[in-house]
UniProtKB/Swiss-Prot annotation:
Organism expressing this protein natively: Dinoroseobacter shibae (strain DSM 16493 / NCIMB 14021 / DFL 12)
Assigned protein family: Belongs to the universal ribosomal protein uL29 family.
Gene Ontology MF annotations: structural constituent of ribosome
HAMAP family xref list: Ribosomal_uL29
Protein's gene: rpmC
Entry GO CC: cytosolic large ribosomal subunit
TM regions (residue ranges): none
UniProt-recorded name of the protein: Large ribosomal subunit protein uL29
Source superkingdom: Bacteria
């Protein structure tokens, strides 16, 4: 997922996606702790996706506040 795709989504969709990504990160941490995680690079990509979504949400909130 790239930033442009995220900017096209509504804030509600972004919040839903953020919750799903955080849940996935939680599950990946448990898999790593129990030794079941095979693709360790997925943790990094999920962590970066969480940051990307949070950044876009902040940008949208700032833009909404600036227009009011």
């Amino acid at each position: 997922m790239n930033a442009q795709e995220l900017r096209d989504k509504t804030p509600d969709e972004l919040r839903d996606q953020l919750a799903a990504l955080k849940k996935e990160a939680f599950n990946l941490r448990f898999q790593q702790a129990t030794g079941q995680l095979e693709n360790t690079a997925r943790m990094r990509s999920v962590r970066r996706d969480v940051a990307r979504v949070a950044t876009i949400l902040t940008e949208k909130a700032a833009a909404a506040a600036a227009t009011e």
